[in-house]
């Protein structure tokens, strides 16, 4: 489905899949560049769709489900499959340029392979808990390290993490046990905090990290020395603002827009904080949020539980 934000309507629809996949629950990983939509899925297909010409440019069946986000570097599409194998594809024709096998995990959890990129390197965190730095041009491994605290891989202690964050100098890994700050050049540990986070952290002003702990503390941390600038109880802040009894808020996502922090709750409310940690506004969304929100032309878009697109200006 191609949705026009300006026209506020669906302008194009396209179905790649044959009837035999009609009842199969599909999970699509999507990235867009120059009116071409690149898609990988949990069946094993990888394909490119030209939005203007309304046609498939190419399609490949790798036969192993993809299980990562997408990245683009120059002529390369980069993705990983459920076996933790990293692939570099030619975005012109979909052919495989290179692949790098990494450690597999037989038991799967909700964590998916994660990719982050800067101008020189790709960072690949797999479900085993290993972090790889790979040169974007040569596709060779610079270094790798394992962040998993155990080799006993059972359902109770599988590695979990939020998405990788980097700022060209530091890599931030927020796992189920620790918050790691690593050196981009060699992967050495700068420092780590005994804090588990529930949402992807955000880097602000290049040297500060904003994140939410699993106990709903909103924390702003100095990335250079690891000191906390503030630590705020979100539950208490909401209770004080609304003059209600303190309850546990269930959080879905957060984003920065116009120098304000927006925190999305599972119960369809959105909390607007300034970057000093003060609540500016509490607003009910027009419908209950189903997908993770995205930002398009200063509008926040999401899909609700009726599969309708909603937006907030």
Predicted regions and their residues:
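WD40 beta-propeller blade core
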Residues: 1, 47, 87, 132, ...
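Short loop/turn segments that connect beta-strands within beta-propeller blades
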Residues: 5-8, 50-54, 90-94, 135-139, ...
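Residue-level marker for isolated small/hydroxyl-bearing positions within beta-strands
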Residues: 40, 80, 124-125, 173-174, ...
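Beta-propeller domains
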Residues: 127, 172-190, 197-198, 206
